[in-house]
């Protein structure tokens, strides 16, 4: 068994996710095992545009954006599970649903969020994943996320 880590830098992430600034919320993938799990990070900076209004005096990362980042991590795992190569043109994984979302800790500027997502099952192009967002080892958010594989017209 190899101890080699599968990583993705931002250049590779951009090949898989259609998101761009300011909505690309994954900075790096530290490791992944296709069909099993993925570990990604987001470095949270005071320069994030959402901090201008949420909240100016005491900035807190909106929970919905933590979930969006987790969904982006699940999309990366789904693509890497389907094919280790660059995704085929016109194929996307859409956020399809969420269950049991829980928020346990605020995320503030200067934090580094670690996203751990695990594939639970896949059937007919619908993937079910469990994800946790951690800061300094503490769970900030957890949820079950569903995503759907769809081909789009180009």
Swiss-Prot record:
One of its GO terms (molecular function) is (3R)-hydroxyacyl-[acyl-carrier-protein] dehydratase activity. Gene3D superfamilies: Hotdog Thioesterase (3.10.129.10). NCBIfam families: fabZ, PRK00006.1. Involved in unsaturated fatty acids biosynthesis. Catalyzes the dehydration of short chain beta-hydroxyacyl-ACPs and long chain saturated and unsaturated beta-hydroxyacyl-ACPs. The active site is at residue 54. Its EC number is 4.2.1.59. It comes from the Bacteria. Pfam families: FabA (PF07977). The gene is fabZ. It is found in: Cytoplasm. It catalyses: a (3R)-hydroxyacyl-[ACP] = a (2E)-enoyl-[ACP] + H2O. PANTHER family: 3-HYDROXYACYL-[ACYL-CARRIER-PROTEIN] DEHYDRATASE. It is an enzyme of class 4 (lyase). Belongs to the thioester dehydratase family. FabZ subfamily. One of its GO terms (cellular component) is cytoplasm. Keywords: Cytoplasm, Lipid A biosynthesis, Lipid biosynthesis, Lipid metabolism, Lyase. This is 3-hydroxyacyl-[acyl-carrier-protein] dehydratase FabZ.
């Amino acid at each position: 068994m190899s101890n080699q880590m599968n990583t993705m830098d931002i250049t590779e992430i951009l090949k898989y996710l259609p998101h761009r600034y300011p909505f690309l919320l994954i900075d790096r993938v530290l490791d992944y095992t296709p069909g099993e799990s993925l570990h990604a990070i987001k470095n949270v900076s005071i320069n994030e545009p959402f901090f201008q209004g949420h909240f100016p005096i005491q900035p807190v990362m909106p929970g919905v954006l933590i979930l969006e980042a987790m969904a982006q991590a699940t999309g990366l795992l789904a693509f890497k599970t389907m094919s280790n190569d660059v995704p085929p043109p016109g194929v996307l994984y859409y956020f399809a649903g969420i269950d049991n979302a829980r928020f346990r800790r605020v995320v503030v500027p200067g934090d580094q969020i670690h996203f751990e997502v695990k594939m639970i099952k896949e059937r007919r192009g619908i993937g079910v994943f469990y994800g946790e967002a951690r800061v300094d080892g503490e769970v900030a958010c957890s949820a079950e996320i569903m995503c759907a594989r769809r081909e789009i017209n180009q």
